[in-house]
Every structure is written in C-alpha cells, then in structure tokens.
Amino acid sequence: MSFASLPFVGLVAAGVILYYLVPKKLQWVVLLLASMVFYLAGGVKSAVWLVLVAALTWLTGLLLARQNARPAPDKQTKAAVRHVKKRICAVCAVLCFGLLYLMKYWNFTASALPSALGDKLPRWDFIVPMGLSYFIFQAVGYVIDVYRGKTDAQKNPLRYGLFVSFFPQMVQGPISRYDQLAPQLTAERCLDWRDLKFGIQLCLWGYFKKLVIADRAAVLVNAVIKDNCPYGGAVIASGILFYCIQLYCDFSGGIDITRGVARLFGIDMAENFRRPIFATSLTDYWRRWHITLGAWMRDYVFYPISLSRGFGKLSRWARTHIGGTAGKIFATSLATFIVYFIIGIWHGANFRYIAFGLWNGVLITASLLLEKTFLRWKAALHVNDKRAGWRVFMTLRTALLVFIGRYFTRAPRLRSVFTLLKTTVLHPQPGQLFDGTLLSLGLAKTDFLVIALGLIVLLALESLQERGVQIRAGLEKKSGFVQWAAMTALLLAVFLLGVFRAGYIPSGFIYTQF
C-alpha cells in the first residue's frame, strides 16, 4: 500500500476518526488494527516474518528482564547473570540478523563465491518483507536496551507488536527507540487540532517533495544512468545531480509523510533529516542524513566495538607501537571504518553498495587520522572557521564527495560505476547540455522549470531553518486564513504539479528497497 495511493489516505482517515471516537484506553488498539491492515495489504507471507521477529524479540525481552530481576549479592553472581544475559541477547541477535542475511544476502553471497563453491549452494527466491531491515534493527535495538537495563521489558505482546509494526514507519523508517516511541503509542489522548494541522502540513510538504520534485527528477535519472550509457560526461553528471535531488526529496518526503501521519494521532516521531545540504564534512553529513540509522550504528555497533576488550588490546598495542595519540585515533578510526562498511552492506546485496560504504568509511577514517595535520594547515593559513567563504568552501567540498558517492548507489552495477565516472571526467561533452539532448530524456522545459521552482522553495525554507527560524511556529502566529491558504497552496501544487499520468500507478520510495 503506497503512501501516494487512495487506499492509504483512506486508511489514515478512517484510523484518525476511530482513534478519537473510541474510549481512550482502546486507542492503541486502533493503531494496532490499522498497522495490521496496512501490512497485510502487502501479503500474508510478509506479515508472518514480522510476527516471528516480534515474537522472538518480545520473548527475549522477557527472558532478559527475568535475569535483570535476579538477586546478585556478589561479583560472582553478577558475572554469571551477565554471562547468561549476553548469551540470550546474542542468540536473539543471531537469529534476527540471520533471517535478514538469508532473505537479503544469501543469493548474493552464493553468486559472489567462486563457481566451484557457489554453484553448490542452493538459491532461494524469497519475497523480502516490506521494511525488513527497519523492523529488525528496531526490534534488536529494543532487546539490547533491555539487556543494558535502559528500558523495561514490555509484558503485553500486542503492545510490543504495535511498537515493531506501527504502520507509518514500515515503509522506510525512521528506526525508532522503544523508550521514545512506545509510551506515545499507548498514551491516552484527546483530539488536538494543532496536532491535526501540523500533521496535515507535514504530509502535504512530504507529498510535494515526493510527487512534484522527486518523481519528476526520476524520469531523467532513469533515462541517463544505465548500462551502456550513450551520453557524455556532462549529461551523466546531470543525471547523478538529478538523482541526488530525487533521493533527498524522495526519502525526506517519505519521512515527512510518516511523521505527519503519526502527528495526526498525536505521536511525535524521531527526526531523520537535518538539512544535509548544509553539511560541512562527511561526518557532519551523516549526522544530518538518515539520522536514526546513524544513531543506531553509533549506539549498537560503534560503541560496543570500540569499547570491547579486543579493541582495548588493539588500542594499547597501537599506542605502544605507533604513539599515544596516533594509537588512540587508530582504534577509533578502525571502528568507524567497520561501521560504514556495515552501512554500505545495509543498503543492499551488491558490490556497489559495499563500495559506497567503503568510500564513506575511507574518507571519514582518513579525516580522523589527518585531523591534526589539517588543523595545523588551517592555523598556518590563518583560516577563520566562522567566515562565510570558508563555510561555503567546506559545504561545496562535502557536496562534491557526496555527489561522487552517489555514482555507487545509482549505477546498475559496480563496473558501471567506474565506467560512468571515467566518462564524466574524460569525455564531458558539455555541448550536450545545450543541443537539445536534455529535452530528449523525457522532461519538457516546463518540467525543468517546476523542478527549479520546487528546489528554490525547498532551499529557501531549509536555509531559514538552518539559521534557527522556526517556520511552523512562525506560521502558527499568522491568522487562520494565512495558515489555511498556505496548506491549500501546497495541496493545489501537489495535485496540479505532481507526476500523475494516465493509468497512474503510485511510485514506491527508493529507501523501501533497503
């Protein structure tokens, strides 16, 4: 069930009406039923895997809670309890990530192995459940939080099931934390018109980014970025630029719809984007892009690795053989590299996604290792970090690195990445930008104008937000006429400028496949 479909709009409308009509103690049941309808619309087989993961992690949470409650009067007992908890948590994580590996990566592994070995391995054509990566990460995060004693285990399986399956987040996240989302899902609420208004505003803004900008940019991207691309480097670079536009408006637009729908029920979901276009480094970019995935990797991968006993030994060895500061940075850099390697694999079972993770991992690791050298250069050149020119330079440099990285995530295969990059650099053929080639790729002049105007609006609003301007709070101070006029203008823009064609089939979101 696509976000950009009438059945979804009908489900949300019916859900909101029922939510505020039923007794408050049953409101969470309405959310659970709506989530069941949404997920079952994608097929019963997919729902089975969701139920299995939810059941496994719920039971694991109860087992861990029982261990947490065990009396531990001495160090020996505490150590024994900790050992049992680690084993319980490890078994659950292996089963969950094993399922993820089996469904998303097994066939890729078999095909990547040498034929003498890979040909002997069976292939399975699984239908990967919608949101598999997202709900597994969210459920395992809950288990780890219970293991750490950060949150109490949920005893009610249906309430826990709602946390795992809450329908707005099933398409592409965000990856929520139990202590932040679960209490909101089961809270009792009265109708708040501000929540409805903010929710509608967020949804309309998300649909604007998705249907007006992203889906229009996708037409050019699909026409250019493909195997045996016949165009010169300038057109290819334009295709990647439009892909960057498509990806951001598609992903952030979908998250806006997710957060908007949740807000209709009075639920404030985690922010997943913070104006990544203004990032001044790759590290800063990943703090602004897909925030909940980065936070998950930080809390459940980076810290456990860097604080582990093995990494402690490695850090001490590095400080002894490389030097105090350099040794400490070496261990941190290695943990960082591992995280971005995993982020690359998370995006998909393809060597180009692994290369994407390595691209980011190598650059960010290098920045950590060379940070002091870079600071010395800045001091020698008397660079003022606060000057606008320096910030513009850092932002453009980061944008270029992100731009190059997008060749990896959009090219059909890894070999195509290097072919497209080579053509971009060695055979630019800039004349194709002006000889009518761009207008032969499926977009008319009016489409380019709509994209340009949409981006101007988007950049203007995000620029204000970057400066600390609270746009919705400012709009709230305006008269009711101005507020409804703004929402009406957005609604008209979506319906009049959205990419709806004859026989329209709602387009999916790019990050759904991840």
Which sequence ranges carry the predicted segments?
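Membrane-embedded transmembrane alpha-helical bundles that form the catalytic cores
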Residues: M1-Q513
